[in-house]
Regions:
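Anionic-ligand binding region
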Residues: 42-45, 56-77
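Small/polar loops that bind or transfer phosphate-bearing groups
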Residues: 36-37, 61, 80-81
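Broad hydrophobic/π-residue packing in well-ordered secondary structure
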Residues: 6, 56-59, 92-93, 109
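Structured C-terminal cap/extension of enzyme domains
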Residues: 67-169
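Glycine/proline-rich, positively charged
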Residues: 1-57
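Short linear motifs at secondary-structure transitions and domain/linker junctions
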Residues: 33-35, 52-55, 60, 68, ...
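Short, ordered loop/turn segments at secondary-structure junctions
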Residues: 8, 63, 82
Length: 169
């Protein structure tokens, strides 16, 4: 099975040079094929993409700046908000392949607005699970210490999503 190094310093607290990890890691991990690059350091991402004549696959992990990662050469994206607005991301991928930056930016803004709402409600796990429930997929409550959503919060979340036309995406 292919192995990808999951680079997400904002959550793990581990911030190492990914390019060096890929080169040295490949010596010890034969099935290392790339990284899920969840960081906004696009300079470092570009170095990883160019390593050894594109030897490693770089998957972009920041939903709200996907077009930047694709423009740098990421081969794909992996993100939590793809679960509830997949058509937005498909439109970004398709329009980037066709060099239609206007459409890509239009859809990227939808992603950004969605992420802003999620952050307002406690971030990816808490806000994301609540959105999944609102679209009809109940993934259950978050584990402690993350507080479950109250009925009032669900109503406010729905209102904020309505304000950005989320249910029309």
């Amino acid at each position: 099975l292919p192995f990808y190094y999951y680079n997400m310093p904002s959550i793990t607290g581990v911030n190492l040079p990914v390019d060096k990890f890929l080169v040295e890691g490949k010596k010890k991990i034969p099935n290392l094929v790339g990284t899920k690059f969840t960081h906004n350091n696009l300079m470092e991402m570009g170095v990883c993409i160019e390593l050894e004549q594109h030897r490693f696959e770089v998957l972009h992990g920041y939903d709200e700046i996907l077009i930047s990662g694709l423009a740098m050469g990421a081969v794909a994206g992996v993100g939590s908000t793809y679960n509830y607005i997949p058509n937005v991301y498909q439109a970004i991928f398709d329009s980037m392949k066709m060099n239609d930056l206007e459409t890509a930016r239009h859809n990227q803004i939808k992603s950004i607005r969605t992420v802003e709402v999620i952050i307002k409600y406690g971030g990816g796990v808490r806000g994301g699970k609540a959105i999944m429930k609102l679209i009809g997929i109940d993934c259950g409550s978050c584990r402690l210490p993350i507080k479950p959503f109250s009925v009032d919060e669900y109503e406010k979340l729905r209102g904020d999503l309505d304000a950005i036309k989320f249910f029309e995406f």
